[in-house]
Amino acid sequence: MKRVFLVGYMGAGKTTVGKELAKLAGLSFIDLDYYIEGRYHKAVSQIFAERGEEAFREIERNMLHEVAEFEDVLISTGGGAPCFFDNMEFMNASGTTVYLKVSVEELAKRLELCKHTRPVLKGRSGEELRAFIAESLEKRNPFYTKASITFDAEKMLTESDVHDISNALMKIL
């Protein structure tokens, strides 16, 4: 029985690497945000807007506890999931946690391309986006760094890079 939790900031590649790594490891893949959306029949951004962050974080915690009961699974968490309640400690006690670490500069490049699909980033670009990421990451890093494994996911430009990162993680897990 194996459980792996991927943590890291939005844009770090948790879903992209997670799918590939799960395939290589013979594990089921669950993206926690998509799991929540499937259960609530609403986008995470809509749940956030309608119920507020506190209610969303409670839903997220409950769904995290639910999927952590599954066996032979790789779970990609939302960027904020490790930072609320005792979620990080819970994940560490339930399986192997892997922090996909990416620099502020690289995250800003990646997120600039998809800022229109991420409500918290709308209207931010350039230096404002970079400053927002830096501030958020500084608050979240104390949680992320509690992961069992920290992995540098800075260079993930091509499908081949994703495959290489997944293969490297397979050797660690």
From Swiss-Prot:
Task: Identify the pathway.
Answer: Metabolic intermediate biosynthesis; chorismate biosynthesis; chorismate from D-erythrose 4-phosphate and phosphoenolpyruvate: step 5/7
> Where does this protein chiefly localize?
cytoplasm
* Named cofactor requirement(s): Mg(2+)
- Write out the entry's keywords from A to Z: Amino-acid biosynthesis, Aromatic amino acid biosynthesis, ATP-binding, Cytoplasm, Kinase, Magnesium, Metal-binding, Nucleotide-binding, Transferase
Subcellular localization, as worded in the UniProt entry = Cytoplasm
Q: Which residues bind Mg(2+)?
A: T15
Could you say which enzyme class this protein belongs to? transferase
Reported EC number(s) for this entry are 2.7.1.71
InterPro entries the UniProt entry points to: P-loop_NTPase, Shikimate/glucono_kinase, Shikimate_kinase/TSH1
Molecular function (Gene Ontology), one example = magnesium ion binding
Q: Name one GO biological process term.
A: aromatic amino acid family biosynthetic process
Residues bound to substrate are: D33, R57, G79, R140
Which Gene3D superfamilies does this chain map to? Answer: P-loop containing nucleotide triphosphate hydrolases
Q: Which reaction does it catalyse?
A: shikimate + ATP = 3-phosphoshikimate + ADP + H(+)
Q: How is the cofactor bound?
A: Binds 1 Mg(2+) ion per subunit.
> What functional role does this protein have?
Catalyzes the specific phosphorylation of the 3-hydroxyl group of shikimic acid using ATP as a cosubstrate.
Can you state the subunit structure given in the record? Monomer.
Q: Which HAMAP family does this chain map to?
A: Shikimate_kinase
**What family does this belong to?**
Belongs to the shikimate kinase family.
Q: Per its UniProt record, what NCBIfam families does this chain match? A: PRK13949.1
Q: What is this protein called?
A: Shikimate kinase
- What is the protein's species of origin? Parabacteroides distasonis (strain ATCC 8503 / DSM 20701 / CIP 104284 / JCM 5825 / NCTC 11152)
